[in-house]
Amino acid sequence: MKRFFAILGAALFVGNSGAFAEQATLIDFSKLVGEGNTGLHAPTTIDYSRQAGSAYSAEDKAAMKISLAIPSWEIELASSSQTVENQTLSLVTAAPVKQDAARYGGETVMGVRIHFPSFGINSFAVIKPPFTIPAYATLGDATAQNAVAGGQFDGFGVLKNVGVIKSIQINILGRNYLNRLSLLLEDQNGDEREIVMGYLNFDGWKSLQWNNPNYQTEVRNRDLQIVPLYPRSAPLIKLKGIKIHRDGSQEGGDIVSYIKDIKVIYDQAVVDRNSDVDDEAIWGILRQREEQYRNFELAKLGNLQVLRSLEKKKMAKEADFDQAAPAAAAARAPATN
């Protein structure tokens, strides 16, 4: 933990006391509302139809898209808790807040229901996006007027130019559960860290906050180094998931919560130098660096979604036995005196 947040950024501070902390939103679920009949969130939509074979029709392929819209998020239970009942009853949904609510009135937030085992066992559940959020994806046509090269998921689970993290905050509505909540974050090297935010033993909205105990407010006390800039200094963080722990001594069954957003206060890794040349626009090294990994992840995502689409077609459509057949048989039966 100390290495992740103290060395990351301290080593990238570029010896410039002009770097300053700023606040940014890592993700805001109220902005991840599905649109129209598709239910997709257009700015975060990914097309995985290229992973489908020729057996699929053009209509099927046109529907092979997925986004970060709230209902697309998944809950992954600990392996010891993955029973059919627990998995079926653990889900994510878009939850509207009442118009007259004191906070976030009229907005839509992420609603979470987790069904833990009824018996005493240590367990956890991870609320995770439907795919690994890419750091340098581009929305649609990279030449489009509003497209930002490599910036499709900026503010949708990705923050760039992140040096030393000072504080992290999650706005969440609790229902007096004793479960502990933590965040799973990943840096530009693929290293994942878990940040414990606190317990959900409160009722109503609350801002759970983590403060970096290793954050140095005095520049004189920082380990300042001069390091090469582009393309070396490209630190970032992205959200891997939201983890809720259940202690074996706690009561099992359902827990319910609602999540609005996650915010971060951090030092810039590199101060905007108002350079006369846009390095990334010319060389694209950062995008190329992630392209192979991203393509692998998207291929894996596409294969999974194609298999799910195929499985959905094979599933039984009937909710119950047809009552028409027994009724018709009864009508044909000869009358008895």
From Swiss-Prot:
Record localization: Periplasmic flagellum; Periplasm
Primary location class: periplasm
GO biological process: bacterial-type flagellum-dependent cell motility
The keyword Hydrolase is assigned to this record: no
Taxonomic superkingdom: Bacteria
UniProt keywords, alphabetically: Bacterial flagellum, Periplasm, Signal
Signal peptide stretch: 1-21
The keyword Signal is annotated on this UniProt entry: yes
GO cellular component terms given for this protein: outer membrane-bounded periplasmic space; periplasmic flagellum
Job of this protein: Component of the outer layer of the flagella.
Subunit structure: The flagellum consists of an outer layer composed of repeating units of FlaA around a core that contains one or all of five antigenically related polypeptides.
Protein name in the entry: Flagellar filament outer layer protein
